[in-house]
Amino acid sequence: MKKTLLAIILGGMAFATTNASANTGTINFNGKITSATCTIDPEVNGNRTSTIDLGQAAISGHGTVVDFKLKPAPGSNDCLAKTNARIDWSGSMNSLGFNNTASGNTAAKGYHMTLRATNVGNGSGGANINTSFTTAEYTHTSAIQSFNYSAQLKKDDRAPSNGGYKAGVFTTSASFLVTYM
């Protein structure tokens, strides 16, 4: 009896001190070290804004080209002195440009937005930003005061396989990362 009781007590103690396993995981942290940091804002016709109005496009064609700039915020002297930079773009893209991310019955079909760097200097650019060309490199002999772009709604060259062209709302978002070199 004593041996049985001792075995029960020792067995209970062994289980009482056992640690429970917990799930593990991984956390990713990203950062960037640059020689210049500053706030970059989109600007249309001298007005800083985070929304670019592409206007309207006829269902049979293209919209009007809308010019805008990415400019360092006032007082960003470190950034305003740089002559070389690159801008990496990401978003919902295809080989033509940026996709329409609007959904539902009111979404336009068969259209995309082109985005083109227009003042790259001696750098690489001038082509539409798309899945094959996501970076515009700026190489200037004097300080880069702004990164100039044009955006335009365009009818896809190929007819959509999901019911053809349809008038409606066009919405897309693009993220950019400026790296000064």
From Swiss-Prot:
GO cellular component: pilus
Origin superkingdom: Bacteria
Keyword Cell membrane: no
Keyword Repeat set for record: no
UniProt cross-references to SUPFAM superfamilies, sorted A to Z: Bacterial adhesins
Disulfide cross-links: C38-C79
Site (Required for receptor binding): K154, R158
Gene3D superfamilies (UniProt xref): Fimbrial-type adhesion domain (2.60.40.1090)
Chief subcellular location: other
InterPro entries: Adhesion_dom_fimbrial_sf, Adhesion_dom_sf
Signal peptide annotation: 1-22
Annotated site location: Required for stability and transport: Y180
The protein's role, per its UniProt record: Fimbriae (also called pili), polar filaments radiating from the surface of the bacterium to a length of 0.5-1.5 micrometers and numbering 100-300 per cell, enable bacteria to colonize the epithelium of specific host organs. FanC is the main component of the K99 fimbriae.
Family assignment from sequence similarity: Belongs to the fimbrial protein family.
Protein name: K99 fimbrial protein
